[in-house]
């Protein structure tokens, strides 16, 4: 089988597309020339949190992370690491291959952890040993039986950790209050600025991209004077959520945790004028 390029080469965001030079995904055949094309293979994260790195090395920089149950489409395996893309936000990185498993069909009912952390019990009892703690946002497939979900792959989670969770961005962000700042993090165990707002808006069904510059391309620009609670405020390399017109909730390296503080203080430290964007 062969493909013919449809026109001049286009630029595809390398953090979201396998567009070369070594790996080009099959979906880009006709747009990007390649000696061979690869069709990503669907796998799933089997550990509570899994760092996505810039290269196939445990010492490589963390660029994001997968949470338990999130799908990860891989195109290559090298040195015990898999190169792939998260289905949650299309972000590309390398993860430990041994922390992945074959993904089952996605046509079943999926449950999401809505607690800050949910104990994964060895049996359907609150007195059973805890084999892991699953973070907010973890995705679980399984069968509800009484008060517990029997998780596909093993373990049980209490149904109260899967229901009646935050229904808006403010409540979701509040779950992260005091969480450590962690470059590449997306959970209450450690989160960065773009990861925090991504997780907060996700409970409203709003899909934010992973990095601040990519998120800045989304939403609607709003004049600073017209800002309101729920808007996102951007600076170069940073973002936070307005909880009202003058206070910002954000994960930051100044306090090394998630805090809510005066917007004016953040702007003064940033040394740049903020840009406000609205997401509805």
Go through the PLM ranges and name each one.
Residues 45, 74, 142, 234-235, ...:
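A generic structural signal for residues embedded in beta-strands
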Residues 61, 129, 221-225:
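A structural connector/turn signal
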Residues 206-264:
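...with weaker cross-activation on analogous glycine-rich loops/strands in unrelated enzymes
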Residues 269-280:
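Low-complexity, Gly/Ser/Thr/Pro-rich intrinsically disordered linker/tail segments
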């Amino acid at each position: 089988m062969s493909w013919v390029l449809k026109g001049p080469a286009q630029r595809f965001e390398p953090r979201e597309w396998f567009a070369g030079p070594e790996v080009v995904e099959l979906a880009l055949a006709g747009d990007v020339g390649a000696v061979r094309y690869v069709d990503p293979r669907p796998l799933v994260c089997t550990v509570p949190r899994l760092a996505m790195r810039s290269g196939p090395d445990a010492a490589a920089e963390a660029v994001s992370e997968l949470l338990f149950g999130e799908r990860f489409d891989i195109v290559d395996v090298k040195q015990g690491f898999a190169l792939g893309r998260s289905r949650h936000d299309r972000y590309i990185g390398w993860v430990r291959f041994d922390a992945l498993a074959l993904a089952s069909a996605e046509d079943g009912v999926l449950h999401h952890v809505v607690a800050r952390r949910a104990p994964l019990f060895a049996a359907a009892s609150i007195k059973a040993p805890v084999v892991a703690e699953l973070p907010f946002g973890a995705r679980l497939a399984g069968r509800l039986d009484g008060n517990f979900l029997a998780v596909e792959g093993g373990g049980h989670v209490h149904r109260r950790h899967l229901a009646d969770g935050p229904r808006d961005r403010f409540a979701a962000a509040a779950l992260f209050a005091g969480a450590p700042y962690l470059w590449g993090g997306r959970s209450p165990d450690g989160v960065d600025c773009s990861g925090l707002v991504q997780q907060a808006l996700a409970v409203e069904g709003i899909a934010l991209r992973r990095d601040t510059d990519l998120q800045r391309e989304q939403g609607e620009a709003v004049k600073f004077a017209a800002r309101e609670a729920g808007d996102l405020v951007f600076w170069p390399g940073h973002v936070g959520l307005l909880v009202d017109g003058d206070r910002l909730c954000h994960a930051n390296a100044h306090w090394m945790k998630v805090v809510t503080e005066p917007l004016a203080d953040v702007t003064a430290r940033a040394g740049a004028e903020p840009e406000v964007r609205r997401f509805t």
